[in-house]
Amino acid sequence: MATKKKTDQDLQLDKDQLKASIVRHLRSTLGTSEQKASPEAWWKATAAAVNEQVYERLTRTQQTHFKKDTRAIHYLSAEFLMGRLTSNNLHNLSLYKICEEALGELGLELTDLCEQEPDMALGNGGLGRLAACFIDSLATLNYPAVGYGIHYEHGLFRQEIQDGRQIERPDSWREYGNPWEICRPESVQEIPLYGYVETVFGDKGGLKKVWHAGRKIKGVPWDIPVVGFGGHTVNILRLWESRASEFFDWDVFNAGGYIDSQAEKAQAETISKVLYPNDDTDAGKELRLIQQYFFCACSIKDIMRRYKRVHGSDFGNFATQIAIQLNDTHPTVAIPELMRVLVDEEGMDWNAAWDISYQVFSYTNHTLLPEALEKWSVSLFEKVLPRHLEIIYEINARFLNDLVEPKWPGNDAIKAKLSIIEEGTVRKVRMGNLCVIGSSKVNGVAEIHSKLVKEDLFPEYAELWPEKMCNVTNGVTPRRWLLACNPELAELYNEVVGKEWPLQLDKLRSVVKFADDKAFQKQFMTIKRHNKEKLVKVIKAETGIDVSAEAIFDVQIKRLHEYKRQQLNLIHIMALYRRLLANPDYDMHPRVFIFGSKAAPGYKLAKDIIYAINKLAERVNNDVRIQGKLKVVFMPNYRVSLAEKLIPAADVSEQISTAGYEASGTGNMKMALNGAITIGTLDGANIEIAEEAGAENCAIFGLNVDEVKSLKGRGYNPYDFYYANSELKAVLDWFDTDYFTPGRPGELSSIKRSLLEGGDPYLTLADFASYSEAHKLIDTWYRDPALWAKKAIINSATMGKFNSDRSIQDYVDRIWNLKPCSIG
């Protein structure tokens, strides 16, 4: 008799069923009892109980996709900053309140158990968090999708602060197992590296290339189910772990080489050991290229396996069934890898293979910074991926001859600029150029960014392919970034606009009509106050610093980079401190400046800025002369779970990058959605946030993109601003003293040098005066509680555009051409 298909209704648990399931897993899965179980055991038992729901729905999703032979998007990203999944999965399965009650009857707090979960920190910042939001939205909107990345053993480092300095520690996020992932040994892939290429006669008489690998690595897949909101679709994030093909040499071991016998195992496992190994050395560069190829090759093989399971070796439908999105340049090598598989392994002719590959790939550009558009030396490519270099040469030759020469005949300068190969003392492979040439669509991630991609970064490519370039403004999932992280505000919105807003964020716009309503303002600001009070306790526990929820909470949380200009925030705080020292009665509302940031291990100036922030904090926070009007807090080990505590409590959102440098930003969206007011430049998504909320509800300052170009074009001299502004000069000169580093003068001088002798490449000094005035405006607004509440409410209510569901729908309509697949 056929098994009856389970519906969503059949799968839904009540409180007693969930409680019984948790206790059962505590005993049978974890082998412990209620009396002696640790909080971690209770958390894992809860996850196991929830996984019964997750895997049932995952199986149903996969069976439906297979049966309907759906077109799917395969999202390749070196980063997936997933954070914690317990709360997220419970919300998406509509089980959060049920679980809270079930655990309450067992004498447990769900929020306490959620704290047992380590962050899945497989990313560095916005790039990885965007990928996580996108796969959430794909599942929520019922689109068939697979995320592909690397199963890093350590992910991003755990940041400790010692004497003000950043110290990197390994982040062993799965040291004791992760209940949300499952290993799939049946889908292991074998990946070749090194070796040489031989030209031989094929079976049909033509010439054929054979790559004889010098070494092979195994890619072991770990699947993390991605539960869409409502629990209908459960897609997967597949992460690849590297292992040796032959990880133990018995002969060497028996001959006494106990350590050498495991050398291959150690070398292979290094590939998926850490996110972004330091590439200052040749060995580091080689490891990073291998890391990128490893996950791309595993993913392409897996995509081929899935396709062949239905279509065999008939590739006529490949481009109609498969879409691959390259999230930045890290997965670029997937393009020559697919060509290698189609031409060398499947015997397809070049033109047919290129036609398929070109249709399949799309590329998202995330940066206008030249150093972030990766380049690899030709010699390194030749050593590690000899066949891929040949394929890149062929792609390049055909592109230059067939497209560039007819368009710009005899123009060698244009050819040199557009070529995938950069000529010079050290010849290099330009991965950004390869992405554009090998993809059918290229998108930027905010309107201003996409305009600059077309006009400044890739103008000739845009001229060749005007239809190729498009925009998809980034977004964030409101399920995590409002429903889960700010439950009080979520409940208020449920009462006012109904419970559909997590799927239709535009519904919040109807709240604007309450922006002047005194009763609603009181409710809204009471919730903000509660969130600030919670953060006060977190700050005390994490840093030992006492702050008051009465103060303005001014928050800058993002990775540390000069273009993001934490140094501008720093020197403004120093200026405020000088004003207070000069006049203890200086009229300002008490302010707490909160930073959360990690610097790349090899980025010395970024680490110096962290050190300066902490040294400033030590001095300011303990100076009784300023009567507690100014506090500085650096929250160590910034991560998704910490962001979920900081964002609901933020009054002011610092989005102060140099105009033209921040592609989009998503922290700006999250904080505005939670009722923070943006102080920012006209850069990235700030422009669109100001359009949605109204420029009068944001504190916009500084040079715009055109003014930045104009100033740089005229010849920017930071000394002009240094000598013209006595306050700015005094602040910068402070860095040379030992005021913040007693007995060690000049320890902070590198920051001043970067802003003066270093040419201040990100125009920090040029924007200082305008930034200072914008902060005075913030201060004035905050002193008028009704005005501030109105602006905060409008900011929150008008962020509907920045739902990642809208972003995904734009990708579907403009690039991927997917159809939703209803499950059940």
What is the predicted function of each stretch?
Residues 2-824:
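A conserved ligand/cofactor-binding region detector
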